[in-house]
């Protein structure tokens, strides 16, 4: 732990952890080619107030909580902030056919958005939608964030499918969502970073129009899509690329924006090319197509809109010219990302060429496909040094 924290402090000042709340690992569990596949990413919460017990190193009472606090303390001592990815848009209870863990039994009509016929609205794409702006649910979310801030001393939260947090109980988008304003102005959370994934699975896309109250930042999905296309040679969108590199001022505070007063300028913009969803940066320049066969869905899962380029050969290669071009493209991407106005974010392992071998949806791959291959740090040390240089630039 100490070694990895010291390594990380050499290049970053914050780490965003994927969901660490207790979740249902057995949801949609199945066997594919002799391998047992479980929910790995953690986006099916069961309890918002407890860390996932399976992350503990020993089967001891509250070992997971103690070790998480030790991790956060160690990261803080190395100058690294900790941001939690939180999932308040749905739970692991699913739709009418799903399990009952908690909220269905407490008060189904209060905690979930229901149609007039009593069915579950599915703005999350996961079977149900948390009724975030109901007063009781609103208070629960606030108390949860306060709990993690006070007891675990986390520095920020990234909200998965955050546009759901701005929907009315009937599912319609609100102009001034009570929950978002409550979190923005809460005194306990005043120094905590709030980061939105400003869209949902119901078609609500709010990048540049999220109800931010000059307090929220957001993942800039437009930056990702635009720069991925531009970097692989789609020069027709050079104008949009220039806007994105210069800070997306048309969205977050600059020319031609109708939402300037809503955002806190360029600090509201989190630029990224890669995250847990989709290709790693190495795979972005090693594959033209996704290769998700190991997930067991005949390669139908995961996005087809990857905006990637394999540099002349699909997948693994021993061709020195192809490999040289791939690492040049990664350096190009890193240079653009670190030079863009806003806050840069990249996927752990990108700094030394980690690969998922073309799988762009590793939600069920708790194995070498998803695990970071630390041996690549030594093999691709020149790339790591380039990342360090650009971050300090």
Regions found by a protein language model. Give the residues of each.
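Short histidine-centered catalytic/ligand-binding loop motif
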Residues: 318-322, 373-379
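Short active-site segment of divalent metal-dependent hydrolases/proteases
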Residues: 88, 353-354
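Catalytic cores of secreted or luminal carbohydrate-active enzymes
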Residues: 379-393
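Acyl/amide activation-and-transfer machinery of modular secondary-metabolite enzymes
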Residues: 363-374
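Substrate-binding/active-site clefts of carbohydrate-active enzymes
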Residues: 1-154, 161-188, 204, 254, ...
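Short, hydrophobic/amphipathic alpha-helical packing segments
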Residues: 69, 142-145, 327-338, 387
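Conserved alpha/beta catalytic core and glycan-binding cleft of carbohydrate-active enzymes
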Residues: 153, 169-170, 174-348, 352-353, ...
């Amino acid at each position: 732990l100490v070694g990895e924290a010291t390594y990380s402090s050499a290049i970053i000042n914050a780490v965003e952890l994927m969901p660490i709340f207790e979740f249902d690992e057995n949801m949609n569990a199945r066997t594919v080619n002799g391998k047992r596949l479980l929910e790995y990413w953690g986006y099916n919460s069961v309890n918002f107030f407890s860390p996932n017990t399976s992350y503990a190193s020993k089967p001891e009472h509250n070992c997971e909580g103690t070790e998480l606090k030790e991790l956060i303390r160690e990261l803080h001592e190395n100058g690294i902030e900790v941001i939690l990815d939180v999932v308040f848009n749905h739970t692991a209870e699913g739709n009418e056919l799903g399990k009952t863990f908690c909220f269905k039994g407490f008060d189904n009509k209060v905690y979930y958005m229901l149609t007039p016929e009593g069915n579950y609205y599915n703005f999350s794409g996961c079977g149900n939608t948390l009724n975030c702006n109901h007063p009781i649910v609103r208070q629960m979310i606030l108390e949860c964030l306060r709990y993690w801030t006070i007891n675990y001393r986390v520095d920020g939260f990234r909200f998965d499918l955050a546009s759901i947090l701005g929907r009315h109980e009937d599912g319609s988008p609100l102009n001034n969502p009570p929950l978002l304003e409550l979190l923005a102005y809460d005194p306990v959370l005043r120094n905590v970073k709030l980061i939105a994934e400003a869209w949902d699975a119901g078609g609500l896309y709010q990048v540049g129009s999220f109800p931010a109250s000059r307090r929220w930042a957001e993942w800039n999905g437009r930056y990702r899509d635009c720069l991925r296309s531009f970097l692989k040679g789609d020069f027709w969108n050079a104008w949009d690329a220039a806007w994105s590199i210069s800070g997306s001022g048309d969205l977050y505070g600059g020319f031609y924006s109708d939402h300037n007063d809503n955002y806190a300028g360029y600090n509201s913009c989190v630029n990224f090319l890669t995250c847990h969803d989709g290709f790693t940066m190495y795979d972005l320049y090693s594959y033209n197509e996704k290769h998700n066969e190991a997930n067991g869905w005949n390669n139908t899962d995961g996005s087809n809109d990857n905006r990637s380029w394999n540099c002349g050969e699909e997948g693994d290669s021993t061709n020195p010219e192809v490999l040289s071009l791939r690492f040049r493209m990664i350096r190009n991407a890193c240079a653009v990302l670190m030079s863009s106005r806003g806050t840069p974010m990249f996927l752990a392992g990108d700094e030394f060429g980690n690969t998922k071998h073309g799988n762009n949806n590793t939600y069920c791959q708790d194995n070498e496909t998803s695990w970071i291959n630390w041996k690549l740090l030594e093999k691709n040390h020149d790339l790591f040094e380039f990342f360090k240089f650009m971050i300090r630039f």
